């Protein structure tokens, strides 16, 4: 029997503040009675970055003139995925091409590759954070394992179509330069974001801030991270895996 694994962080005003700011406001109209049923209409409004929480990056994020995320073919955002187990990676440990050579032998051309470090779950503060897929410790940002340029070049050479992460993308390797991964920054300059530029320059989409990848037990699954049809360089997604 197929099993569905939800890999998305919840979006709410309680979202962990050091990195993201989410503002969801709700307006309720007066209660009316319709055919004997009391109804109180509600409308919510949301303001946040398209790169907030679980989202997908299109090449336009770093390459001028590329298509908006709403014009990316839908089939690029779902399909067969290779799950690469990196759960033994510790604090500030790089994910390299050598790691992929050893652990990614099951990666095929056209795959989505999911890098399973378990870092989100390792930094969940309590039951609520674990349930909602949210990191609750500053160490999530300051001490996480991170992908490297060599890893990104390996992905491009294998002609994968997307790469998904459950750890911060590449911020932590620059902590010793005085950069931060929190909302206030300062963030690394684009020329230092080698993983972003390597992937997106070659049309490899990035799916960031996944969670619950440790619940995936098989090394190949079907995976979905379909964006909204936005005229923007990225979009929130509801990411999930189907394990047969």
Predicted regions and their residues:
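Active-/binding-site microenvironments in catalytic and ligand-binding cores
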Residues: 1-244
